[in-house]
Structures are given as C-alpha cells and as structure tokens.
Amino acid sequence: KESHDCLARKAAGYLDQGRDLVFLTLGDPTVYSTYMYLHRRLTAMGYEAEIVSGVTSFCAAAARLSVSLGDGNTPIHILPGSYPLEEGLSLPGTRVLMKSGKQMGTVKNALVSGAYEVRMAENCGMAGERLVDRAQDIPEDAGYYSLVIVKEKGETGC
C-alpha cells in the first residue's frame, strides 16, 4: 500500500506539470496487475486515466500451447498463485493457475497425482520461454511469469 501511494504521488506530480504518462504492463492491466492500484488512486485524486486493453497472459499461453480455454459451456477459472490450491483444483472446467512460481513444487505434486490434463507456460512470448505438455515435466524452479492450464483428463482441448 505504501509503495502504491508513493507511486501515485509521483505520477500526480508529473500530471500536474501537464505531462502525459504511460504505465506499461505485461498482459492486460485489468488482470492481477499492479497498475490497477495506481489507477484507483489517481482517479480518486481527480485525475483522468484511460486503460488500454492488452493480451492476457492466459490467452497468449493458450494460443502458444494450442489449447482451448473454454469449449461449449465449460467454465473457466482464473486463479492467482495465492488461491488455495486444493480448492481451486476442485472447481469444474478449466483452471488457470497464475503466478504460481513460488509454490510450483506443490502445484506439480498435486497435478501429477491427480487425473488432469496439464500444460504450463513460463515467460510466454519472452526470452527464456518454456512450454510444458505434462505435469511430470513442470520445472519446480519455474519463475514468477509461469502459468498452468489444468483440465480433467479426457476433456476437450488440452
């Protein structure tokens, strides 16, 4: 919270000088992005702010992996790494586990022992990109920009 307040004050200083600002994000600024903390603060202070949509990491990863996220009436669940894993895996349909790098060993163990079709993308579209087709091959040292797409075995699209 303190760092977001500090950033908003700095941005306001530039805006007060008549400058235009851009806050670039990886992915879309409305999905688990730091930008939204800044956006809320600046608009609450009376500044105008426009959000320009980007390509979400899970859509980019699904395209790179040639995986359908949702077919027919299959629900899609986008879950942050901090979401309780067991609860998330019990949800029906497609589960996208985002930013799970810190706990990838735990994620991998749960997926290997379950009846899941799994794909993983790390650093999708960036240097060091890794694409994985099986839970057993998920690296336990996966980085921050890793996401896992989970479906039930035999489900279409994975």
PLM features: what roles do these ranges have?
Residues 25, 79, 97-99:
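Thr-Gly-centered strand-to-loop micro-motif
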Residues 30-91, 139, 153-156:
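Class I SAM-dependent methyltransferase SAM-binding "motif I" and its flanking Rossmann-like core
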Residues 6-10, 83-87, 106:
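Short acidic active-site motifs
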Residues 12, 36-39, 59-62, 105-108, ...:
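Predominant activation on well-ordered alpha-helical scaffold segments within soluble catalytic domains
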Residues 16, 21, 89-158:
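A contiguous loop/helix-start segment that scaffolds small-molecule binding in enzyme catalytic cores
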